[in-house]
Each structure stands twice: as C-alpha cells, then as structure tokens.
C-alpha cells in the first residue's frame, strides 16, 4: 500500500464514508482508516437497529422475532458498506486505529502514513455517569442492547432523551415492564415542553412508568435474584432485570493524538471547528459527532461531504450550517423539529401558528389526532407579494411528524415566506395540509385560528 495520500479519513462511520466518497469523486487519492467494521454507529448500534426494533414492536412481533429482525436488517444494510465495496469505488481502506503525528503524519499500527489533508470522523461513545454500583450492574447501552436474543421481562431505562424514549416505548410494546428515569423536569429536554408532554403521555399509555426529576443515585443487586434495585433522587426505588443507559455521548478520541497535531477542544470536550469544519491544526478537518454539532446521521453525512470538499478545494470554501437541519424522535407520535422553538423565536420578534392534529381532516380520518404542528415565522411582511414572514422553525408532533417537518426545513433553506406555503395547493386530505393551514394563519385567519406573537 502506498504511504502518501491526498486525503486520509480517520473513521469509517457516516461522516467518514461521506468524506471519503466526496474526495474520491473529485479525483483525489483517498485512504479510509477504520478501527473495526465499516459503517459506524448508525449501521450497527444506532439508526438501523433502533428503527427496526421500533417498527417490529409496532407490528406486534414477539420479542425474539423482533431482535432477530434487527440482526437480519443490520446485516443487509452493512453488506452495502463493506471495505470491499469502498475499494471497488477506488477508496483504499486500512483497518486499525489511526493516530495523528503532526505535520500530516498518521500512524496506523506499524505503518507510518502521510497526507496533504486529514479528516477526523471518529464519532462518539456513550457516557456512563458516575453512580455507585452502576459499573458492576452489567448495564446496557445502545452499543450492546441490540445484541440481546430477546428483551428481558423488566427494564429500567436511564435518560429521557430521544434514544431513551424510543427504546422505552419499543421495549414496552414487546411486553417488557419498563421504567423510564429522567433527571430533568421533562422528557426530550431539547424540545418544547408541550411536545415532551405529548410523548410522555403516549409512553404512559403504552405502559411505561415515566419518572421525572428522578436522577439515578445508586444501583445495588437484589439478593440472589440477579435483579437490580435503583435508588432515585426523588426517594423512590425501581427494581428491574436490566438497566439501559441513554445518558448522552462524548467524543470518541482515545489514542487519536490530538495534542501532537495541535487539535484543540472546546469547553464541552468536542473537537473545535470553524464554519469550514477546519480544526485548529493546519490541514486537519473534522466532521460528525466528534465536533459536538448536531448528533444525527444526516448531519454527519453533510458535514463529511463539506469537510472533504473544503479540505481538497484549490480555491474557495463552503460553510456548514445547522440552521435548517431537521431532526426526528421516532416515538409514536413522532416529533419532528427544525430551527427555532417558540421561546427562541420570541427573542427575534417571531410569530407562531398552531394547528392541533384534531383539526386536520387526514388525522381525523386516520384516528390519529394526538399532537400538533407549530410553525414559527419572523415578523410579518406584506411587500411585493411576499405575505407573512420568513419561516424560522417548526415543531411537528404526530404520527407523520418526521415527514412533515421537511417542508418547513425546505422553506427555511430557501428563505421562503409563509404566504408561499399557504398559496401552494396541497392534496386533500393529506397530512401535508397541516403545513399549508398553519402557514395561512401567519397572514390571515384560517379555521378560526390566527397566528400570535411568540412568547418565552
């Protein structure tokens, strides 16, 4: 194998694959360094297995059948992302752990390599809180839970973010007794309180015991039973067969040699990058979870492509922005989100349109009226046919929330005024009409509803 490359990508997850392919399409010599199987968290321990389990649980499959489907689906997706597939695309692959040496040098095992440019894409890892007794409890994380042959009879899920909520609901639907423990005052702390409350109610309806303001204080084994007792900060106790941690993630950078290369971290411990995704070290870029930006596969893909494009460009560069990047929590109902919340929009003179799903005919006919759509826009303008204000954000909570949010994301990306959305004919009765109806509220009364000023 050659030792001198145009670009070396360290990390073979979503961001790394996107970076390698982007550079290769530009005709550059690319080496991908990956410690383990190509594909990363999304394929093996994240999006693919979790969404498969969620779907299997919703379809009423048995626990064993559901976990079997997870393994089969992961294998199917992974087959399209192997090292051999990458080599067929002209990308060289070297298995091992890459370590920066400075001045474009990279050490992989006994091999010393050199590159004009380097992209770091090593992802993130689960965070384990310092709780007495937790280390000896054989706890699970997203990296280990999908290896189970079947779900245990009872499960304590610690952490009420997207991963915790999704897996708690899926496990409950598979017949497991689930307690979801969250230290804060609401589930989904990055979402609006109303969205979090809708999800909490849905989880309780599925049998999940939701405990809020209840930080985990201690884990102890029950005498001879193999079960665990969890003592919580609110004074209550939970007993369960297994504990699943969903308590956040940290940058995966052990042994990466950041100091040797002059790569600095921010206050939260993520690799510091600028708008180009360049690090503090000359010739080194970073993409994906490692940067501490949006921790989503689609964001990692976009960052990987942007970092590689900027790293290999002869002139000019493209900025990476998270402003119009949507994300989805795949509970039932789904929570789709892009841009500002109402509280954030209040600081910018924003206005809010609100549509309960009970007022959307498609939701009524489907019998799925739980949730709402909230569309956020800037100050109202009426000039040269531009009605309403520019779209600044949206929260969509409904069974199709993960699909509807993308119309708002496109409107944000295009700088569209809400009047354009309202004047675009939407098929009736469709879920997408929710966007049209909400957009109309931002410059006229629709169905007895009119937009109001955003409040903090």
What are these regions (language model features)?
Residues 2-15, 151-161:
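Beta1/beta-strand and adjacent pyrophosphate-binding region of the FAD-binding site
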Residues 2-3, 22, 42-112, 191-217, ...:
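N-terminal Rossmann-like dinucleotide/flavin-binding domain of flavoprotein oxidoreductases
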Residues 8-10, 98, 113-123, 157-158, ...:
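Short hydrophobic core segments
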Residues 10-36, 41, 45-48, 52-53, ...:
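Flexible, glycine-rich terminal cap/loop adjacent to redox cofactors
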Residues 47, 122-177, 181, 210, ...:
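Glycine-rich dinucleotide-binding loop and its adjacent helix/turn
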Residues 72-79, 146-147, 152-156, 162-224, ...:
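Rossmann-like dinucleotide-binding cores of NAD(P)H-dependent redox enzymes
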Residues 92-95, 99-106, 113, 174-275, ...:
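A Rossmann-like FAD-binding core segment of flavoenzymes
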Residues 135-151, 237-314, 382, 407:
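FAD-site-proximal beta/loop scaffold in flavoenzymes
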């Amino acid at each position: 194998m050659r030792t001198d490359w145009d670009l070396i990508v360290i990390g073979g997850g979503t961001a790394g694959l996107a970076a390698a392919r982007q550079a290769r399409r530009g005709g550059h010599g690319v080496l991908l360094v990956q410690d383990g199987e190509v594909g990363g968290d999304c394929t093996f321990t994240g999006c693919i297995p979790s969404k498969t389990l969620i779907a299997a649980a919703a379809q009423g499959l048995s626990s064993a059948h559901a976990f079997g489907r997870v393994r089969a689906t992961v294998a199917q997706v992974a087959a399209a992302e192997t090292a051999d597939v990458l080599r067929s695309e002209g990308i060289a692959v070297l298995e091992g752990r890459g370590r920066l040496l400075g001045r474009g040098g990279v050490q992989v095992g006994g091999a010393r390599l050199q590159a004009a440019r380097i992209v770091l894409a090593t992802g993130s890892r689960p965070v384990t809180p310092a709780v007495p007794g937790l280390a000896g409890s054989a706890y699970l994380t997203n990296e280990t839970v999908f290896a189970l042959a079947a779900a245990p009879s009872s499960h304590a899920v610690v952490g009420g973010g997207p991963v915790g909520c999704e897996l708690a609901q899926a496990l409950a639907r598979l017949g497991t007794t689930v307690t979801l423990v969250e230290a804060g005052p609401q589930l989904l702390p990055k979402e609006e309180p109303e969205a979090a409350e809708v999800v909490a109610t849905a989880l309780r309806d599925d049998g999940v015991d939701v405990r809020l303001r209840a930080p985990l204080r201690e884990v102890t084994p029950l005498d001879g039973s193999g079960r665990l007792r969890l003592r919580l900060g609110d004074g209550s106790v939970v007993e369960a067969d297994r504990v699943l941690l969903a308590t956040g993630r940290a940058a995966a950078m052990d042994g990466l040699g950041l100091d040797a290369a002059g790569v600095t971290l921010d206050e939260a411990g993520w690799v510091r990058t600028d708008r180009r995704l360049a690090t503090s070290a000359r010739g080194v870029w970073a993409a994906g979870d490692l940067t501490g930006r949006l921790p989503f596969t689609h964001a990692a893909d976009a960052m990987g492509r942007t970092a590689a494009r900027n790293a290999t460009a002869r002139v000019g560069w493209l900025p990476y922005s998270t402003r119009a990047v949507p994300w989805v929590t795949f509970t039932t109902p789904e929570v789709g989100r892009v841009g500002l919340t109402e509280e954030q929009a209040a600081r910018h003179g924003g206005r809010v349109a609100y549509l309960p799903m009970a007022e959307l005919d498609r939701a009524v006919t489907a019998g799925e009226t739980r949730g709402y759509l909230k569309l956020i826009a800037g100050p109202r303008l009426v000039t040269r046919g531009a009605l309403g204000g520019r779209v600044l954000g949206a929260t969509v909570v409904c069974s199709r929330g993960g699909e509807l949010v993308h119309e708002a994301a496109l409107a944000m990306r295009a700088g569209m005024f809400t009047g354009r959305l309202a004047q675009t004919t939407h098929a009736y009765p469709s879920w997408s009409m929710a966007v049209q109806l909400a957009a109309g509220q931002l410059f006229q009364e629709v169905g007895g509803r009119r937009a109001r000023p955003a409040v903090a």
